[in-house]
Every structure is written in structure tokens, then in C-alpha cells.
Design a protein with these regions (language model features):
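Conserved S/T- and glycine-rich ATP-binding loop of Class I adenylate-forming
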Residues: 33, 39-42, 50, 77, ...
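Conserved C-terminal "lid"/linker of ANL adenylate-forming enzymes
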Residues: 289, 316-322, 330-332, 350, ...
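ANL superfamily adenylate-forming
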Residues: 1-30, 151, 401-404
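AMP-binding/adenylate-forming catalytic core of the ANL superfamily
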Residues: 238, 243-244, 254, 263, ...
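Conserved AMP-binding/adenylation subdomain of ANL enzymes
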Residues: 57-76, 84-126, 137-139
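Gly/Ser/Thr-rich phosphate-binding loop
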Residues: 122-127, 136-203, 214
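Conserved AMP-binding A3 loop
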Residues: 25-26, 34-61
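Conserved ATP/PPi-binding loop(s) of AMP-dependent carboxylate-activating enzymes
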Residues: 208-212, 224-255, 295-297
Length: 416
């Protein structure tokens, strides 16, 4: 078998030649199927995304043209995301190699022993913010991370708090110049459509829309284009947009839209696009609920607001069924060390949700009265999926079960 030794011999090449019974013709092969990636299913059922050779190559070219990486040999990138997810295989591995970097894989995971030999050589880190928690728990004080310079996240967002925690961690390991980069993407765009790497890192954005892609932000109800810096749903057009969902032509048709004679992929991502192509992600279409008065609540917006509070480490917001308003907001909150999970703390969070806050850009952030959650539970940590994304389905199920229990308790009270 080829690949079990460090070197490939001429005999190995001969075996490869014998395996192919006909000439490999690269001409017109761009539309050929290349691989199938699976969405993480963090907020729904996983989908099988069929990508062509052209999709993968175009994505690599778009990234290289966007991030302007210098021709540096020897840079090593740590991939910490499972291969079955797009961010793990397509972005962290294939696109990294297309950019001329070396990929370091850890199929058996990181532990207190192997990090001593692996991490000192790493320059780039690919993973969700959950990777920081892993590193904090297993990296001893004597491990030198001075060669580290970039941490690229996908799946979940680096908040101001997680970035601050990350800087403190790397500073304790001789690295004071680490850059944290938020990015965003879908499996349908080979796992990425924006990047902060190699460009100016603008707070509260996921970086620039890749050069080569054609973005369009629209009103999700009318599908009419909105102005720059107005909130809407992001559509993407480009050669990196997937061929379709494997075996699901109707689903493919549903996710691709035609506007002015051009076909776009609907990312279902809500945010604002600036004139210089920076995108501020404010939510996802799949993560909202509509009240009986017609008001729409985006869970990400509420979640990000609560995460800014001085006593909150992190939080998750989901919809909870309600007989009167259809839904209410349910927040699961991880408190900072030393903060008591009592009623006073709960009331403090409710009170802050009615006030104005300022983000790092000194912009005012405020919730509407109908966006304020009606109940808060304190948890020790946020549950994650295998892809290191927040397990929204788990929290949605918990909220549904709580609603059912509330109904049962009300019935018991009436019987008494």
C-alpha cells in the first residue's frame, strides 16, 4: 500500500500508473464530482453537499487572492476539526495546502504529552473557540508557543472575551503577537466565503468576502437588495458554490435563488455588508422565532448581547414554546468565576438586557423589549457537538421539555 512509508518510490509511481487504465484528461474535468462534505447539523439535520473539482480549486484561488499570503516556506498549520466536517477537511487541509502551507494532523487528539512536541512548531491554528479551552487544560507552563502567530476560527465566533482569554493564554507561553481571525462559510461554498487572515482585522466582523465571489445582501421576505450597512440575508455567487445536495434536487433548488438572471446560493446568514466587503454577522435565518404580533427575534443577536455583560462568560439563547406569544426567549448562561448563580444575578442580567451597551467599535447595541429573554438558567459549560459547535438542538430540546413540564405543573395546580 502506498502512503505507509515516509517516501514514495519509483515503483510506487509505476503502481499508480498501472491502476489507471486510461489517460487522465484534465481538460473539461472541472465540472466532475470531487467530494461530498456534510454539514454539521448543529441547528438541523446534516446535509450531503456535492462539490466539483472547480468548486474546490476556485475556493483555493479566492482565498489566496484575498489574504495575500507571503511566499513563506515551512509555516505549519494545526488542524483540530474532524474530517467529516467541511471546516476540517476542505478549509483546514485542502485549502491550506493550496496556499503552500504544511498541515499538521492530530487524528488521536491532543493530550498533555504530545502537545509538548507538536505545539512549539505550530504557526497557524484552525479550530473553533473550543480549542482554546482544550489548550488551557492540557498545555503545561513550560510549553513554548513563541512561533504561533495566527488563530483562525470557524463555526463559532470569537467574542471579545474569548479573544482576551486567548491572548492571555498565549502570552503565558511566550507569544505576545497572536492574531485572532474570525471567518465564516458554509459547506456549500467549500466551508468559507470570508476571511480575516492577511487583512486588517476589523472587530465584530468575519472579515472580507472573498475576492472572486459576488455577494448580495437582500431582504429575506422581498428578496430585494438592501443598501450597504443595512441588515439582510447574504447571498453568494461564484465558482466555489456547490453543485447540489447529493440525491436531493428539490432541496438544491430551494437553496439556490435567481435574481436578475444570476443564480446565487442563499447562505441563510444575516448581517451587514460594508462598501469594502467586510461582513458583520448578526444571526442566521434558521435561528430566529416569530412572535404572535409578527415581531421576529434573532437568537444570535440576543446571545451576543448577553455575552457582553461583565458577569457572563458565555451563553446560548434559543426559542421556548409559549401558548400566549407562540415563543419566548430562553437563555442558558455560564457565569464568570466567583459570580453566584442566584436570583440576584438573574435579575441583574434581566435588568441589563433593557439597557444600552457599547461594542469594541463604540457602537450602541440595544435589545428591543420583545427580544429580552423571559427565563434564564445557569449552566457550568456550553454543550458542543462533535464539530465543536454549540449544540443548539440540545438546548432547543431542553426548552421544549421545560415548556411541557410547565404545562403539567399548571394542570396539577388546577386539579388541587
Amino acid at each position: 500500500m502506498i502512503g505507509y512509508n515516509d517516501f514514495i518510490s519509483y515503483s510506487d509511481l509505476a503502481n499508480v500508473a498501472k491502476y489507471y487504465k486510461k489517460i487522465i484528461n484534465p481538460i473539461q474535468s472541472g465540472k466532475n464530482d470531487a467530494l461530498i462534505l456534510y454539514t454539521s447539523g448543529s441547528s438541523g439535520n446534516p446535509k450531503s453537499v456535492l462539490l466539483t473539482n472547480e468548486n474546490v480549486l476556485a475556493s483555493g484561488i479566492y482565498i489566496k487572492n484575498t489574504i495575500n499570503l507571503p511566499q513563506t516556506k515551512g509555516d505549519k498549520c494545526l488542524c483540530f476539526v474532524p474530517f467529516k466536517y467541511p471546516y476540517g477537511f476542505a478549509t483546514s487541509v485542502l485549502l491550506t495546502m493550496m496556499c503552500g502551507r504544511t498541515v499538521v494532523l492530530v487524528p488521536d487528539g491532543l493530550n498533555k504529552e504530545n502537545v509538548k512536541t507538536i505545539l512549539p512548531k505550530i504557526n497557524y491554528y484552525y479550530g473553533s473557540p473550543a480549542l482554546l479551552d482544550v489548550l488551557k487544560n492540557i498545555v503545561s507552563n513550560d510549553v513554548d508557543l513563541s512561533l504561533s502567530h495566527t488563530f483562525v476560527t470557524g463555526g463559532d465566533f470569537f467574542t471579545e472575551k474569548t479573544e482576551k482569554m486567548g491572548r492571555e493564554f498565549f502570552a503565558n507561553h511566550n507569544c505576545n503577537n497572536i492574531t485572532f481571525c474570525n471567518g465564516a462559510g458554509n459547506a456549500e461554498t467549500v466551508a468559507t466565503w470570508s476571511s480575516s487572515v492577511g487583512t486588517v482585522v476589523r472587530p465584530n466582523t468575519v472579515g472580507r468576502i472573498l475576492v472572486g465571489e459576488e455577494p448580495l445582501v437582500v431582504n429575506s421576505e422581498t428578496m430585494q437588495e438592501v443598501k450597504y450597512n443595512e441588515e439582510g440575508t447574504l447571498l453568494i455567487r461564484g465558482k466555489n458554490v456547490f453543485k447540489g445536495y447529493y440525491g436531493s434536487p428539490e432541496l438544491t433548488k430551494h437553496e439556490k435563488v435567481n435574481i436578475n438572471g444570476k443564480e446565487y446560493y442563499n447562505t441563510r446568514t444575516v448581517g451587514k455588508l460594508s462598501e469594502d466587503r467586510f461582513f458583520s454577522l448578526t444571526g442566521r435565518e434558521s435561528r430566529f422565532y416569530i412572535l404572535n404580533d409578527g415581531n421576529k427575534v434573532y437568537c444570535e443577536k440576543v446571545q451576543n448581547f448577553i455575552s457582553l455583560l461583565d458577569i457572563v462568560e458565555s451563553c446560548v439563547v434559543v426559542d421556548k414554546p409559549d401558548d400566549c406569544t407562540r415563543y419566548t426567549g430562553k437563555a442558558y448562561v455560564v457565569l464568570k468565576d466567583g459570580i453566584l448563580p442566584d436570583e440576584n444575578t438573574r435579575n441583574y442580567i434581566f435588568e441589563q438586557c433593557t439597557k444600552k451597551l457599547y461594542n469594541t467599535n463604540n457602537e450602541i447595541i440595544q435589545l428591543n423589549s420583545f427580544e429580552v429573554p423571559t427565563s434564564i438558567d445557569f449552566v457550568d459549560k456550553i454543550a458542543l457537538t462533535e464539530a465543536d459547535k454549540i449544540d443548539y438542538k440540545k438546548y432547543e430540546k431542553m426548552a421544549e421539555e421545560e415548556n411541557e413540564n410547565d404545562k403539567k405543573n399548571k394542570r396539577r395546580i388546577k386539579i388541587k
